[in-house]
């Protein structure tokens, strides 16, 4: 399905109240870009919306270093999945009379999450959350899917995905050799894990 068609399908449901939309797919599938695109369409339609990325629930770099997990940063066990699910439950049940819910965001310059950086207001009708493991069928990630009203899976050719990943790692300061090693190593393992969850998506979008 095209992204525009997925939005047209979702748009009427927002008239009835809040929707928690998940956007998932392997690393470098374009999840953040799509989330921002949908957010823009929602705002343009007069529907208050906010993006709450899964990346805000990365474990702190100090924790990863202490547990020797730094080399596999981005794998499922390097996130606070239970905390992420708790936030989505709060967002899902947030009433008009409730106070703002504060969510963390991941700061690339620090390589660490920052608490209380994203405000989810009671009148936000579309909550967009994006990340690799929204459909992962293992605990504690299983609880995340239960919090989503709908989840879209982004799919793109493996060659394009690997090229994007390699370029991204170089942009973050890795050498070409280090970037390729990461893209074809840990990232590839994670991508296969995410691909196995594709069948649980409500919509599959062919990413550009």
Sequence positions of predicted segments:
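Post-Walker A helix-loop "phosphate-sensing" segment adjacent to the P-loop in P-loop NTPases
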Residues: 40-50
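Conserved nucleotide-sensing/catalytic segment adjacent to the nucleotide-binding pocket
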Residues: 50-53, 59-110
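Extreme N-terminal, non-catalytic leader segments
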Residues: 1-22, 26
């Amino acid at each position: 399905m095209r992204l525009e068609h997925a939005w047209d399908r979702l748009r009427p449901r927002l008239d009835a109240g809040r929707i928690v939309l998940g956007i998932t797919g392997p690393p470098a599938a374009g999840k953040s870009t799509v989330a921002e695109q949908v957010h823009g369409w929602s705002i343009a339609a007069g529907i208050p919306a906010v993006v709450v990325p899964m990346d805000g629930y990365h474990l702190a770099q100090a924790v990863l270093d202490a547990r020797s997990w730094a080399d596999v940063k981005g794998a499922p066990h390097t996130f606070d999945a239970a905390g992420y699910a708790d936030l989505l439950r709060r967002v899902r049940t947030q009433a008009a009379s409730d106070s703002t819910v504060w969510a963390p965001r991941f700061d690339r310059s620090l390589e660490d999450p920052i608490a209380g950086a994203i405000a989810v207001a009671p009148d936000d009708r579309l909550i967009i959350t994006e990340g690799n493991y929204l459909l992962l069928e293992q605990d504690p990630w299983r609880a995340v899917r239960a919090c989503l009203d709908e989840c879209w899976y982004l799919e793109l050719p493996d060659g394009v995905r690997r090229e994007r990943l390699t370029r991204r790692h170089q942009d973050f300061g890795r050498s070409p050799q280090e970037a390729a090693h990461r893209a074809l190593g840990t990232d590839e393992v994670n991508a296969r894990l995410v691909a196995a969850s594709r069948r649980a998506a409500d919509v599959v979008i062919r990413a550009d």
